[in-house]
């Protein structure tokens, strides 16, 4: 039932043939007047604005928590907002048949699947077209070949495009993964076959870590993309992450819209994307040659991104994967070429030719991803970034020349804990890289996002860093940056940036007046879990004796589980909120297991059992 609802079921051979025939005829070339936007957050805002500029009526589907979102506020009189129901992705945006039923009821001509969720599901594309809906994206056979990462690698091999050594396809289990890892040698990289955005991906340094990491990444991929398939490849330590933006029509006209560098990453999630710079001519030539060969050989249709690893040590290029959809960072290519990629997606879906499209790259563009996250220290004293959903009390993005903002929040917006943490994309264009960096730094000094914590301060630190400004970095860049900056200063500045000075906690906030009892308040919005799994006992119960390091509960937010202890609570200057030389006894457990709690909700009450 779950696979049916998410569109992950196999259609008959006869139906496949019928749908393929339809894809290559009227359904891929139909006129579009009313489009269903199957997206949320920044992506939904981008697609709504593009659709309206294209003269289309919009039907926006949103989950329960997103019904009052900023994208919903962008709708016009003839547009429609329809509730998908549910909170989690599985209950809402991954429910393919609910989306299609809404599309039929609302009488739309097309569905734009956005960037995440089911945007790379060939089954979803087939079902849409079977129901007479123009799926704004490539043919399903393109997604069969390239949307699945393991299939994409096999396709590249067949076309003699170099790939990183790894598994031939999706891995059946951790035992099979172990065999491949032993053959190519550790360290290895486990990756979601249908993934992206830093989800379902992890480095494994040795055999003892493989089984547990395989299970964990499969669950993470299933939760994020509706498919838990994994593949494995050799991990290259010093690399740049490069990608080519491609666009191709039904008539076979191919366009390459430049190269992007996405090497500034944290936990495989891109933070800064920009126009590629200082690449050897030979490397540029290979990137364009391989990308064009790939999309022409598979008869690709629509917008996509071909991603590569640039091994700095060996000065070699390896194909990594292809995204058969738009990327979050597509505005970088738009800013330097002047080509509106969403507009071109609609044009291709109508059957129009791109033969006359002019692509003339000019200048340098750079994008910052602004995420809802707070920075603090883990038990070892290292910096960590924790999702920080909640209500935005103020959001200010001034309109300025050569700056583009795609935002998902405004004053009063609620950032729910069920999805990714992206709240804004800020893109700058300059005549060169130096000017783009200066523009971004100047602009960030006027941006305000209060009520939630964000990575704005970290973004400023990156842009101010000499190594970044000089282009001396690879995908390990942030690890080096963190060793050069003060963690306490970053934490303090981030809290102030979020407007946290007025709302910071002190000892009086967590003490009951005239009592030896203390409060433990939720540090963030999220799902409250008393134990790591249903099979294990609660971490603490009434009567449990604890200290600052004792795990109390787990809070799940934006697909990340965080262990909470008294040590998780800090004052504005980074000191522990609770006395370090005391022990406490839990006297009351207030929160219910698996319930959603808000920041500041009372979770536990405890009493001190040793003197101050």
Regions found by a protein language model. Give the residues of each.
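Short, ordered loop/turn segments at secondary-structure junctions
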Residues: 40-41, 62-66, 86, 115-116, ...
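Acidic, glycine-rich catalytic/binding loops that coordinate metals and/or anionic ligands
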Residues: 64, 472-483, 487, 595-612
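ATP-binding N-terminal substructure of ATP-dependent carboxylate-amine bond-forming enzymes
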Residues: 1-158, 171-179, 598
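PDZ/PDZ-like peptide-tail recognition elements
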Residues: 502-521
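Hydrophobic, well-structured modules enriched for small/aliphatic residues and gly/pro motifs
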Residues: 93-96, 106-174, 180-210, 216-228, ...
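Short structural boundary motif marking the start of a folded domain
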Residues: 186, 362-366, 516-518, 524
